């Protein structure tokens, strides 16, 4: 983030931080999501906090907060920032609030969260320390079990000054003799769900708009061909993790 923020400061630009998969982790001593004007987090079903679908944005800028509240609610007048903002209002102020509730001051969207979705998400946030600790335990167990295959696999590790949220457990094939698709099919056949990494340059709409960008972004192109995810989440038991490790042992067999 440091180089990005330096560019933004020089050119007087706003920054939006894509923190989609990085809840509750730190970078250079600060929480991910606290560096920019706005940070975006996902609460999709597979993510660290899930409400089933959707996500959230955070900011410490009061003016942006008012705008964001309006945009998520069809562009309504942001007379309410919190649901109890009218508790101490005078009668004249209440009249103004009532008249403004259905006043639309900009084009907006229907991005509101239901109370049930919010309750599910808040319960997970309250339990975040336990849940994140278990993710880290699961990741450590996977790393210890898969390290013997490091001639074939690149295992995940946090960069200096950063932490890893382990929404998934990413792996990359570094042995030319091993085909990613072959390994993925082997794992899937044994009940281990996988997912390919999805660099933007590999998406059909980006290829349609910009053509083949592989030569300009060789790392993304390499990941597109060689990397994949396996699961790493708080509900995985040690037995589940050991089963995953055992399948890798069976696949690599005498290759190590």
Regions found by a protein language model. Give the residues of each.
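PLP-dependent aminotransferase class I/II
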Residues: 1-3, 10, 26, 62-256
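Short, conserved loop/helix-junction motifs that constitute active-site signature segments
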Residues: 7-8, 35
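Hydrophobic "anchor" residues on beta-strands that sit immediately upstream
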Residues: 13-14
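Conserved active-site segment immediately N-terminal to the catalytic lysine
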Residues: 17-51, 66, 100-103
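Short, hinge-like loop/turn segments at secondary-structure boundaries
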Residues: 31-35, 57, 212-215
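Short beta-strand-to-turn element immediately C-terminal to the catalytic PLP-Schiff-base lysine
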Residues: 41-42, 55-61, 91-93
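A conserved catalytic-core signature of glycosyltransferases
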Residues: 44, 52-54, 106, 115-116
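Adenylate-forming
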Residues: 50-55, 121
């Amino acid at each position: 983030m440091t180089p990005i923020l330096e560019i933004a400061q020089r050119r007087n630009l706003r920054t939006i931080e894509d923190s989609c998969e990085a809840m509750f982790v730190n970078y250079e001593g600060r929480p991910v999501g606290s560096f920019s004007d706005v940070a975006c987090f996902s609460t999709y079903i597979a993510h660290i906090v899930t409400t089933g679908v959707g996500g959230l944005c955070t900011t410490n800028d009061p003016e942006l907060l008012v705008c964001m509240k309006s945009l998520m609610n069809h562009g309504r007048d942001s007379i309410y920032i919190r649901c109890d903002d009218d508790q101490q209002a005078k009668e004249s102020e209440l009249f103004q609030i009532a008249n403004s509730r259905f006043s639309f001051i900009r084009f907006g969207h229907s991005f509101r969260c239901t109370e049930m979705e919010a309750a599910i998400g808040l319960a997970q946030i309250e339990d975040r320390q336990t849940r994140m600790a278990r993710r880290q335990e699961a990741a450590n167990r996977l790393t210890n079990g898969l390290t013997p295959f490091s001639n074939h696999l690149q295992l995940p590790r946090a960069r200096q000054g950063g932490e890893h949220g382990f929404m998934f457990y990413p792996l990359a094939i570094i042995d030319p003799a091993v085909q990613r698709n072959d390994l993925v099919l082997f794992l899937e056949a044994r009940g281990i769900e996988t997912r390919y990494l999805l660099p933007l340059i590999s998406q059909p709409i980006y290829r349609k708009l910009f053509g083949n960008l592989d030569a300009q972004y060789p790392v993304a192109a390499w990941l597109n061909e060689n990397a994949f995810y396996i699961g790493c989440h708080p509900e995985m038991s040690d037995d589940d993790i050991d089963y995953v490790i055992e399948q890798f042992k069976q696949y690599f067999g005498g290759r190590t």
